[in-house]
Amino acid sequence: MKYLSIFASALLATASAYGQSGESCRTASDPTLQKPELYAGYDCVNLLDSTAVTVQPTGSGSFTVCKIVKVMNTRGAVANRILKYDYDPLTAHAEFHRVTIYKANGDVINLDITQQQDYAAPARAIYWGARQIMMEIGRLDPGDIIDYQINKKGFTYALLTGGIGNDESRFIPPMRGQFYDIVPFWTTEPTVRKVYKVNIPMEKEMQFQFYQGECTSSMRYEDGRKAYTFVSTDIMPTRREPNMVDLFDAAPKLMMSSTPRWQDKSL
């Protein structure tokens, strides 16, 4: 009970700390304790997988990536002892904002994020110049919960011709003022709640389509801006089949664009 009380209080504090992320950085109670049979055999469970984006008039976005992962067994402990996140330095910059470990015995550990590493991402055959950030967590035990936030700025999905700039201009998309994203809604581990929220200037329009599945969506006005929120709950891992096409063509995904037509993004 001590562990549950500490974790619940910490989640409330975390939700408040996220500020602009609001709804997208809240999570429900831990269902692995309520329905253990549903998650038996899985190495870890994502209690929350959330991304909140604030889009600037230029089309550049500020991303808040929140994830809360519960370790279920020793395999999950080994798999999560190091956190990694990939990004493209041509279009974005990413860094760990905070990492907190809620131990099964009730201890709470806040890691020193100044110890994070940023290095060239491992690659073979073709080297695109991608980078990776990493935080070493160390020893974990079954029942431990990892709660972390990554802040990223920039954009995704564009064909570029120039090199890496040294100023903020590299975070502005080639189609200046336009925002575009493809968001996978499939998972490799059970996920209790997945949220994608994008906040855009009032004068911008946004079209979206959810493929190979369904989610709950809403659009609200917040502080003179439009906020689109997409939520999916109780997601189980997508099963692959022999000779199956890529999951982008078979599993649930969200596509968003501020351009009047999808085709405009391909020009």
How should each PLM-predicted stretch be described?
Residues 1-25:
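Bacterial Sec-dependent N-terminal signal peptides
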Residues 20-266:
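Beta-strand-rich, non-transmembrane domain signature
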